[in-house]
Amino acid sequence: MLSRIQNYTSGLVSKANLLSSKALYYGKVGAEISKQIYLKEGLQPPTVAQFKSVYSNLYKQSLNFALKPTEVLSCLKNIQKNELLKYGAYGIQLIGFYSVGEIIGRRKLVGYKHH
């Protein structure tokens, strides 16, 4: 019984090592491709003026919604099914990116050492 458990866990560990090495390889390939696209397309970070305009518009809209909550409710009531699916997919992607960032930051899949 113990030997079966050891064989199972060793097989599981070897598969995990294989998957992690593949993930590392494809991550590096993706980073290199992204770097080449960044250089060829001439991409650049947004300017300070662009940041200011985006965040000032966001602030104005959030202030407007805070002052007139009935408009928020009317907007939510008028959402179509396709829009709801699209925004739900965006939300799932954001949660996924956040979760991956947390995993990378902790350097482990679950929890911190002191908890």
UniProtKB/Swiss-Prot annotation:
Chief subcellular location: mitochondrion
Coiled-coil intervals: none
Modified residues (Phosphoserine): 3, 62
GO cellular component: mitochondrial inner membrane; mitochondrion; proton-transporting ATP synthase complex
One example GO MF annotation: proton transmembrane transporter activity
Entries under InterPro entries matching the protein: ATP_synth_F0_gsu_mt
A Pfam family it matches: ATP-synt_G
Processing and modification events after translation: Phosphorylation on Ser-62 impairs ATP synthase dimerization.
Disulfide bonds: none
Localisation per UniProt entry: Mitochondrion membrane
Entry-annotated residues carrying N-acetylmethionine: 1
Key words of the record: Acetylation, ATP synthesis, CF(0), Hydrogen ion transport, Ion transport, Membrane, Mitochondrion, Phosphoprotein, Transport
GO biological process: cristae formation; protein-containing complex assembly; proton motive force-driven ATP synthesis
Function: Mitochondrial membrane ATP synthase (F(1)F(0) ATP synthase or Complex V) produces ATP from ADP in the presence of a proton gradient across the membrane which is generated by electron transport complexes of the respiratory chain. F-type ATPases consist of two structural domains, F(1) - containing the extramembraneous catalytic core, and F(0) - containing the membrane proton channel, linked together by a central stalk and a peripheral stalk. During catalysis, ATP synthesis in the catalytic domain of F(1) is coupled via a rotary mechanism of the central stalk subunits to proton translocation.
Subunit structure: F-type ATPases have 2 components, CF(1) - the catalytic core - and CF(0) - the membrane proton channel. In yeast, the dimeric form of ATP synthase consists of 17 polypeptides: alpha, beta, gamma, delta, epsilon, 4 (B), 5 (OSCP), 6 (A), 8, 9 (C), d, E (Tim11), f, g, h, i/j and k.
UniProt record similarity statement: Belongs to the ATPase g subunit family.
Designated name of the protein: ATP synthase subunit g, mitochondrial
Organism name: Saccharomyces cerevisiae (strain ATCC 204508 / S288c)
